Amino acid sequence: MLTLAVHDILWAVGAALLACAAFKIIRVLLLPYTSSLRDLPGPPASSWLLGNVSELMAAEDFALHFEWLEKYGPTMKYNVWFKLPELLTIDARAINHVLSHSQDYPKPEETRVSLVEILGNGLVVAEGELHRRQRRIMNPAFGPAQIRELTEIFVDKAQQLRDIWRNEVTTCGGTVRIDVQSGLTKMTLDAIGLAGFNYNFNALNPDGKANELNRAFEMMFQRMADLERSYWLIIRSLIPILRYIPDGYTRDTAAAQKVTRRIGMQLIAEKKAAVRQAAQSGEKNAGSELRSRDLLTLLIKANMSPDIPEDQRLSDDDVLAQVPTFLVAGHETTSNATTWCLYALSQQPNVQHKLREELWGVPTDSPSMEELNALPYLDAVIRETMRLFPPIAGTVRIATKDDEIPLATPYMDAKGRMHDSIRIDKGTAFPIPIIGMNRSKALWGEDAREFRPERWGSIPEAAQQIPGVWSNLMTFIGGPRACIGYRFSLIEMKALVFTLVRAFEFELAVPVEDITKKIGLVQRPFVRSEMEKGTQMPLIIKSHTRE
């Protein structure tokens, strides 16, 4: 009797699961014919199974996206698996609507789940009220006054990298081929360690071995890279039950998180104790710990402020989640952007020369934040780099309800009707094409794909409508979820470019057509003929001598 009951229960559960799966399959198969996006203009699907996916994978550097946008207009669709329509728009009003209503357009659940496993529920991943609380408490740590205090760290680490490269140039007789990506990645790791939580990774120390926390974060970066290319991890993120199957990914991630938690909690405890002691002894006698510049100390100090109600404070776990968040958000993004900046300068000797002349007009090797920000051509070079080579090419939001998204530019649907809005069904993905907006000819003019810092003297009126938090660019996005650390990244990058371009002349070490990129979490450079070596940017470097 009991056996029969168990059998009936199992049969009922199996039937329910089968029915649920069948419903989802049927819904997916019908979506091309029921989706609110079905009448948007766009290219025909190459096949029922793949849609336009094979064409997209064959194209490089979003070339096909740009071709489609020029052909079909700023708001269109293309087809992914099973001919499912995917929205693509660079309409500034539409994107501003989505970014300014972030509560209705969170990150996709599968993306959040994958990132939480690696990073914890920090500012980049958190949604809703938790994100608002984290942001409110963290905002003061990223203000101009705080970034000013961190500039010395950026300059010191940039000079350390300069000296390492200078020694290599001298050893090799005046010129040397260097993978600048590697050195810049080590520099930004050291900088975010000190500026983020006063921890020295010693990544630039050529004789030192990676310390325990360094190794743990290297494992996290590797696992994040795996997310970009592993079909198993993609499927695992989409099917919740598969996440409970132990594998090498989960074991490595758990081991790295264990180290991060142990050392992170130790850092938090030490900083909380220092803040308490400083508060007891008074502001004037606070000592070096209270005046510490690192972001984690500032976050803990703000979180312990009597002005913050107890129920609005972050838990130690919430604070801990910011440690890997600081590292990921402030490490590879800046190093990759600076790598592409040096690449662009290697292709534009006149721009490189003009920039170097401006930099040599500063009478010090160790500029302040104000001195860096007072250099107009350096600022234009950084803006143009961030426009043409945004570290993150795009992001995605998911509609949590049916919505009507307004458009600045109306579109004509497949039936010849004009629309000044897009109707979005609940669950529809809304991509934010950062690189698409930054390189759009409709927004930036016919030379939008060219590196031309002079454009920043007067940008087109259309580009002025882009709803970015900085410089009419989508690089740091906009709205309530705009990148909180954009000032941090920009000053660090300026310190690097200032120090390195003053000291060296840069040429590309391989033919320009040999340089390509892979689009993942960040846009990493590769050499086509040396793909087995992984990400790299080989430049010929020689010391610059003032005449």
Curated annotation (Swiss-Prot):
It is found in: Membrane. Pfam families: p450. GO terms for molecular function: heme binding; iron ion binding; monooxygenase activity; oxidoreductase activity, acting on paired donors, with incorporation or reduction of molecular oxygen. Its cofactor is heme. It is a single-pass membrane protein. Heme binds at C483. GO terms for cellular component: membrane. It comes from the Eukaryota. The chain crosses the membrane at residues 9-31. Cytochrome P450 monooxygenase that is able to use 7-ethoxycoumarin, anthracene, phenanthrene and trans-stilbene as substrates for oxidation. Belongs to the cytochrome P450 family. This is Cytochrome P450 monooxygenase 215.
